[in-house]
C-alpha cells in the first residue's frame, strides 16, 4: 500500500508544484487521507521536489544554458556584466540568499510548528487574497529585462515565505512580481528559474541527511520516495507547459478561488475532527 501512496503523492507534487496553490500544503493535506495517514514529512517533500525542479531544467534548458554561459563569461570580462543574461545569473544568486539563510535559521520550526494544518489553511487563504490583489492592481508593464537589484531582493524574500506550507513558492514569488509591475508570464518564468538553486540545495541536503542516517526516512522508503520523485518529474513537466500557456491568456482568479475554498475546507475538517493538525 505504501507504494500506491507514494505514487499518489508523486502525482500531487507534480500537479501542484508549479501552480500557485502550494505543493507542500497539498502533500500535507492529501497525506492525512491516505491509509497510513499523516504528514509525509519535510524530507519527503524536499526530495520529491528534486523531480519537479529537474522538469524546470528540462523545460527551460535553453534559457538556463544561456544564463550560465553569459554569467560565467562576465566573470572573466569576456561579456559585459550589463548583458541581460549575465545580470539574470547574478539576480538569481542574489535572490536565493533570503531562503537559504532563513531556511537554515528556521530549520527546526519549518520541520515542526510550520507544518501544522491550522497554519497551512490560514496561509492558503491569506496568500490567495494577496495573489488576487496583486493580479488586480499590478500594472503588468515590466518584463524580465527590467529586473534590477531591488526587485531581485524582493523576489528573493517572497520566495522565502514558501518555507511555510500553504504560501506556495511560485505563488509567493509571482505575487511579488505582479505587485512590482511585472507581467504574469514574466513573474511566473522568473519564479521557476529562481527556485532552482533553493529547491536543489534543500532537496539534496534532505537526501544526504536521510542517506547518512541523520534523520529517519519517514513513512516511505527511499525506493518509494524515488518513484514519487520520478512521477513528480513527468507530471510536472506537462504542467509547466500548460500553466505558461494558461496565464498568457487568463488571470490567476481560478487559483485564488481554489486556494480560498481549499483553506476553508481544511478549517472545517479540522474543526469537526476529521483532520488533526
Swiss-Prot record:
It is an enzyme of class 3 (hydrolase). The chain crosses the membrane at residues 41-61, 90-110, 117-137, 191-211, 227-247, 254-274. It catalyses: di-trans,octa-cis-undecaprenyl diphosphate + H2O = di-trans,octa-cis-undecaprenyl phosphate + phosphate + H(+). Keywords: Antibiotic resistance, Cell membrane, Cell shape, Cell wall biogenesis/degradation, Hydrolase, Membrane, Peptidoglycan synthesis, Transmembrane, Transmembrane helix. It is found in: Cell membrane. It comes from the Bacteria. Its main location: membrane. It is a multi-pass membrane protein. GO terms for cellular component: plasma membrane. Its EC number is 3.6.1.27. InterPro entries: UppP (IPR003824). This is Undecaprenyl-diphosphatase. The gene is uppP.
Amino acid at each position: 500500500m505504501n507504494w500506491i501512496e507514494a505514487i499518489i503523492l508523486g502525482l500531487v507534487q507534480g500537479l501542484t508544484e508549479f501552480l500557485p496553490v502550494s505543493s507542500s500544503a497539498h502533500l500535507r493535506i492529501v497525506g492525512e487521507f491516505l491509509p497510513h495517514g499523516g504528514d509525509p514529512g519535510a524530507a519527503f517533500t524536499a526530495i520529491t521536489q528534486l523531480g519537479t525542479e529537474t522538469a524546470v531544467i528540462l523545460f527551460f534548458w535553453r534559457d538556463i544554458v544561456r544564463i550560465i554561459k553569459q554569467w560565467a563569461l562576465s566573470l572573466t570580462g569576456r561579456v559585459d556584466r550589463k548583458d541581460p543574461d549575465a545580470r539574470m545569473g547574478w539576480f538569481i544568486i542574489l535572490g536565493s540568499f533570503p531562503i537559504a539563510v532563513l531556511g537554515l535559521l528556521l530549520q527546526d520550526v519549518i520541520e515542526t510548528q510550520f507544518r501544522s494544518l491550522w497554519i497551512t489553511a490560514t496561509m492558503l487563504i491569506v496568500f490567495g487574497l494577496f495573489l488576487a490583489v496583486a493580479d488586480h492592481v499590478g500594472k503588468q508593464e515590466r518584463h524580465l529585462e527590467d529586473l534590477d537589484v531591488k526587485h531581485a531582493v524582493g523576489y528573493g524574500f517572497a520566495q522565502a515565505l514558501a518555507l511555510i506550507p500553504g504560501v506556495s513558492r511560485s505563488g509567493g514569488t509571482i505575487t511579488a512580481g505582479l505587485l512590482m509591475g511585472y507581467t504574469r508570464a514574466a513573474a511566473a518564468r522568473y519564479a521557476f528559474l529562481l527556485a532552482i538553486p533553493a529547491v536543489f540545495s534543500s532537496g539534496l541536503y534532505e537526501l544526504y541527511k536521510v542517506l547518512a542516517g541523520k534523520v529517519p526516512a519517514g513513512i516511505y522508503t527511499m525506493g518509494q520516495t524515488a518513484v514519487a520523485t520520478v512521477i513528480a518529474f513527468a507530471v510536472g513537466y506537462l504542467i509547466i507547459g500548460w500553466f505558461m500557456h494558461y496565464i498568457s491568456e487568463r488571470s490567476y482568479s481560478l487559483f485564488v478561488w481554489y486556494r480560498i475554498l481549499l483553506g476553508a475546507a481544511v478549517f472545517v475538517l479540522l474543526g469537526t475532527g476529521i483532520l488533526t493538525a
